[in-house]
Each structure stands twice: as C-alpha cells, then as structure tokens.
Amino acid sequence: MLYIIYQEDRDDGAEIRASNRDEHFAYLARHQDILLLGGALLGDDGVKRTGSCLIINVPSREQAEEFSRNEPFRKAGLFKSVKIARMRRGQWNPAAAPKTAEGN
C-alpha cells in the first residue's frame, strides 16, 4: 500500500535540518526498498527548505507510522506537523519526471 508522508518544518528548524541531514539520508538509504519518492518541500524562492514529502510502499498504516516516527528529522523535532495518508497510484508517468533534483 502506498502512503504519503507530508511533513512541515518548524519555523526555527534550519539548524535541526542541517545537523541531522546525514542521518536523514542514511535512514532513507537503509529503506530504499520501500521508498518510491522523497524530497524537500521548498518555499517559493526554490531554495528555503520548508518540509519533506515521502511516498513509501508498506503493507500497513502502522508500518508507515513506524517509518515516520523513526525518521531522524522527526526524532530530532524538526516538524511542526506530520500528515500520513494512504494513497492509490492513479496517473504514473516517469517520463514527465524532472531530470535533476532541481526540477530541470
């Protein structure tokens, strides 16, 4: 089952994000078998990180919640809100995906 995890940063979270970045990426690498898509949410300037969005494939909501609870940014208190929702894959067009992380 697919779950989207939408997490908004605290307004004062830049230092928390910076100091836990390596642990965050290591955690995602250890869970690459369930991670379909992930990335930072950005402000309109395209630079400021304002949160994170992950789409994972796990058998149950409980497993999605466990994955989220153990994610280093969340454990460090970065997020002011976390929303987990089950989703159904509707449209799927990998050819439309950007070629770079910057969206180009």
Set out the residue ranges of the language-model regions.
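Conserved, structured core segments of small domains
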Residues: 1-104
